[in-house]
A protein has these predicted regions:
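Charged, often glycine-rich, active-site loop that binds/positions anionic groups
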Residues: 88, 113-130, 228-236
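Extracytoplasmic
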Residues: 60, 130-246
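Signature of alpha-helical transmembrane segments and their immediate interfacial
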Residues: 1-37
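Short amphipathic beta-strand/extended segments in non-transmembrane regions
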Residues: 71-73, 88-112
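Acidic-histidine catalytic/liganding microenvironments
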Residues: 13, 97-100, 209
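Envelope-exposed proteins and targeting segments
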Residues: 66-68, 99, 159-161
Length: 246
C-alpha cells in the first residue's frame, strides 16, 4: 500500500510535492526565529530536584553571586616564592577584568596559628601566606590540616589550590512588570552574550599563564556557556547534514 501511494501520488506529482515541501520548509524556517536555547543554573538541574529547591531557599534567604572556579597546580611547590608570586599575578590579572567582583585564593586565608601571640591579637592582625614575615611551611600546614579549608581551597595532597572568582551581579531589568516579552527576551540574550564574552576573556588569561602550571576552569556559568556553544554547533552540523542528505 505504501509503495502504491508513493508511485501514484508522489512520483506522478513531483511539482506539487516539491511545492508542498518548499512551503513546509519556509514555514518552519520562519518560525525558527522563535526557537530559544536556555542553559542557566536552574535548567542544568531537574525541576523538583531537592538540590535545586535547597539552592532556591538559600538564594532567597541570603542572596548569592555567580562565581567561577579555577584549580591551580603549580610547576613547583605550592608555597615556593615562584608559585606564590605566580598565583598573586594570576589573581590580580583576573581581578582587573571589569566583570569580576573579587578573587579568593589560598593566599587570602587568615592564619591564626602562625604565631604564639594572644588569640585576640591574632584575630585583629592576622597574617596570610603572601606576607613576608610568616613561617610559610607552618601556615601551609595549618591550612592543609583545617577541616574548613582542606578539599575546598587546597587539595588533600597539597598540590592543587582552588581559586574562587566572584562575578558582579547583573543589572536587573527596571520596571519589569511594564516590559514586553520581547524586551525581557532581549535582556536575557544580552546577559548570555556578556557571559560568553566573560568566559572567553578569562580563558585568554588562563592561556597566558599556562607556563606557570596546570590551570583548569569550572563553574556553572562556564558549563552553561559551553552547553550553549556545543548545542548550537550540533544544530548547525546536523542541519547541514540533513540538507545535504535531502
Amino acid at each position: 500500500m505504501i509503495t502504491q501511494f508513493y508511485q501514484n501520488i508522489i512520483l506522478k506529482n513531483p511539482k506539487s510535492i516539491l511545492i508542498i515541501l518548499l512551503i513546509a520548509l519556509f514555514t518552519f524556517g520562519y518560525y525558527s526565529k522563535d526557537f530559544k536555547l536556555d542553559a542557566s543554573s536552574e535548567t542544568l538541574l531537574i525541576e523538583g530536584d531537592p538540590d535545586l529547591e535547597y539552592l532556591k531557599e538559600i538564594t532567597n534567604r541570603y542572596g548569592s553571586k555567580e562565581f567561577l572556579i579555577l584549580t591551580y597546580t603549580p610547576n613547583e611547590g605550592m608555597i615556593s616564592d615562584v608559585s606564590i608570586n605566580n598565583l598573586l599575578s594570576l589573581k590580580y590579572k583576573i581581578q582587573s577584568l571589569n566583570w569580576v567582583h573579587s578573587v579568593i585564593t589560598l593566599l587570602d586565608i587568615p592564619l591564626l596559628n602562625n604565631s604564639d601571640a594572644p588569640l585576640q591579637e591574632r584575630l585583629e592582625n592576622f597574617k596570610t601566606l603572601k606576607d613576608e614575615d610568616i613561617d610559610k611551611e607552618r601556615g601551609f600546614n595549618e591550612i592543609l590540616s583545617s577541616p574548613v579549608f582542606r578539599n575546598f581551597v587546597i587539595s588533600e595532597d597539597g598540590k592543587t589550590s582552588g581559586i574562587i572568582v566572584n562575578i558582579k551581579n547583573k543589572k536587573p531589568i527596571e520596571n519589569i512588570s511594564n516590559k514586553t516579552k520581547e524586551e525581557i527576551e532581549a535582556h536575557k540574550d544580552l546577559i548570555k552574550k556578556q557571559n560568553h564574552q566573560n568566559i572567553l576573556e578569562i580563558r585568554d588569561v588562563i592561556k597566558s599563564y599556562n607556563n606557570i602550571g596546570k590551570i583548569n576552569l569550572g563553574g556553572i556559568p562556564m558549563i552553561a556557556d559551553d552547553m550553549m556553544t556545543f548545542i548550537k554547533s550540533d544544530i548547525v552540523v546536523f542541519g547541514l547534514g540533513v540538507l545535504l542528505f535531502i
